[in-house]
Amino acid sequence: MKSLGPVLFPIFIAAASGFVSSSTSCALKNVHKHFAGVNPQEPSVAVVDEMPDALPPLKNHYYLLRHGQSTANVEGIISSARSLAGSTKHGLTLLGIEQGRNSAPSLIDFIEQDLSDDGITSTKKVYFYSSPFARAKETAEQCLKGMRANDEIAKRIEELGLKVNEEVLLDDGLMERYFGRLDGTELLTYAYVWPVDTFDPTHVAFDVESVAAVSTRIRSTLLDIDSKHEEGGNHIVLTSHADVLQITQVYAAGIANVGMFSQYRFGNGEVRKMGRTVDTLPEAVPLQPPERGT
């Protein structure tokens, strides 16, 4: 059966336009009835009324690594519950493990590019920070294994003089964006949120964590991590989730509307340099629902 995603997504985008209009918002409010309430055991999400200040210059190099394919990706469901932090639920599939390991050469390529730049002086130290969700932590661990996978990669690391910290440092600030009443539902329900994000980065429809709230915690997390490596010039890998990393890359780059983040989607196991200018962003793609398994 052909997926209805490409057909329904434009409809939801049109509906999103109505969501921000007082004359049509009542129609979307009725959609809420189809979803269960927020789990009372889940912590409440901060309501943020505005986007944070621009991210100031940082002392270290940053790289963004999305987790490999997870069992939740294969099930085709949204997995964002805070109770997943520290658990083994929704970890990597065999393909996800492979994607995590295969991210290592690309990461080394980015680090090598930064070593050749005239900007921040490098310490050649590499650190991995990760969301506490299993799929992210396991991806960081697999990337580390990938850096030791064969003689060719090991030789590159030695020639570059990299000193890789083998410990994966967990940080709650890198957790998945919380999707409130949509948590555990099918991927297509992203269509109730992403289009509205483009109009209003502060919205909390369905009790989701807003783009502004994610940007605010990412800003705090980056500044905190940067302060822990005050000497500067370190190479820091942030292993996290699609929405969080997409928001991070456009916020860090200084794009005018961070709510457009979903048009710069990360693939499973994809690593990117965290650029600080808009011209470092990849080409934007039309808003589409994610496919099952991604």
Give each language-model segment a name.
Residues 68, 130-134, 173, 218, ...:
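Short, well-ordered beta-to-alpha junction loops that form the rim of enzyme active sites
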Residues 1-27:
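N-terminal chloroplast transit peptides
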Residues 192-213:
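Short glycine/proline- and acidic residue-enriched helix-loop micro-motifs
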